[in-house]
């Protein structure tokens, strides 16, 4: 059985986990408000990062919750995207193959948090960590991130 949003948030809360919540489809502002209200009802909004391939969803989140972590999902990075993310105070969640040490540095210089997906190779995870990526999405936590990599200063 697939949990409802409320049940999912309750599970995250029970185990003290950050929720990375993907808005998979385009949502009307009214529907985004309903989603936010469910999360607020559980008292867990401070532990949620919203992500979406739909840029309008991210703009709606930003309008409704100016300080809420929100990351635009994409496969590619270009200068226009960086400008838009910086202007709208959004983070980036990008396919890991698009990342380089240089563009991570460029994104950080513009105040943009960098998340990447999906990294299941330990060597690639270590490389991305050494480059300064902020988050890694993985299917295999134990294989993707070693304690030495995630706990270094």
Segments the model singles out, each with a brief description of its role:
Residues 1-2, 71-153:
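C-terminal active-site rim and adjoining tail of enzyme catalytic domains
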Residues 1-76, 88-90, 94-95, 108-110:
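Metal-dependent phosphodiesterase/phospholipase catalytic core, i.e.
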């Amino acid at each position: 059985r697939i949990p409802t949003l409320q049940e999912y948030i309750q599970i995250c809360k029970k185990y003290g986990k950050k929720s990375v919540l993907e808005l998979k489809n385009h949502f009307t502002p009214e529907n985004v408000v309903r989603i936010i209200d469910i999360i607020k009802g559980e008292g867990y909004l401070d532990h949620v990062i919203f992500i979406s391939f739909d840029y309008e969803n991210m703009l709606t989140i930003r309008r409704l919750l100016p300080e809420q972590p929100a990351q635009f999902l994409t496969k590619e990075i270009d200068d226009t995207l960086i400008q838009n993310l910086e202007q709208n105070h959004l983070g980036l969640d990008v396919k890991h193959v698009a990342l380089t040490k240089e563009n991570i540095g460029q994104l950080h210089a513009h105040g943009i948090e960098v998340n990447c997906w999906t990294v299941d190779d330990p060597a690639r995870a270590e490389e991305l960590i050494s480059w300064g990526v902020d988050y890694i999405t993985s299917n295999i936590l134990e294989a993707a991130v070693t304690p030495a990599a995630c706990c270094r200063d």
